[in-house]
């Protein structure tokens, strides 16, 4: 009888511990995701105040140091500059959600797996005064990678 009680109590404890850990991890991951998007907005606003954005990113920006991807897109969706990929191989971006939103409403955001880089990426885009769109992106780990990273294994 004592053995059955011990096994059930252990099982309940393990289930509760896993539940608590899951809720905690997903809560922190959501907070982390929100912070990433806020950081991207800040980067876009700072770059948008730079007079010659395209000249700055081509000359002074280093994606390895800044850990960001910057893309400049014209009003037709053609990529004028990308810090991480060859623009000659890139598709037209006019139908990307964040670009559509930026062209229509002045700014847009999205989270998706990047076709170009094959990674999960957060995107924030803002329409510049000249009509072009400045998009900043950051790669992030998935929630599963996040979980395995914090586990003591």
Q: Model regions: which residues?
A:
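Extracytoplasmic/secreted envelope proteins and their assembly/folding machinery
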Residues: 41, 96-99, 140
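Membrane-proximal, non-catalytic sensory/regulatory domains of signal-transducing membrane proteins
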Residues: 64, 89-130
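Short, hydrophobic beta-strand elements of compact beta-sandwich sensory domains
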Residues: 122-147
């Amino acid at each position: 009888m004592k053995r059955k009680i011990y096994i059930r109590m252990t099982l309940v404890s393990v289930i509760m511990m896993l539940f608590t850990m899951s809720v905690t991890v997903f809560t922190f991951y959501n907070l982390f995701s929100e912070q990433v998007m806020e950081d991207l907005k800040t980067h876009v606003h700072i770059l948008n105040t730079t007079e010659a954005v395209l000249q700055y990113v081509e000359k002074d920006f280093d994606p390895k140091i800044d850990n960001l991807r910057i893309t400049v897109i014209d009003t037709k969706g053609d990529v004028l500059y990308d810090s991480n990929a060859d623009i000659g191989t890139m598709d037209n971006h006019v139908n990307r959600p964040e670009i559509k939103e930026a062209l229509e409403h002045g700014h847009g955001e999205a989270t998706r797996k990047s076709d170009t880089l094959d990674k999960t990426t957060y995107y924030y885009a803002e329409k510049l005064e000249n009509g072009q769109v400045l998009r900043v992106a950051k790669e992030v780990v998935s929630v599963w990678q996040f979980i395995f990273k914090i586990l003591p294994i």
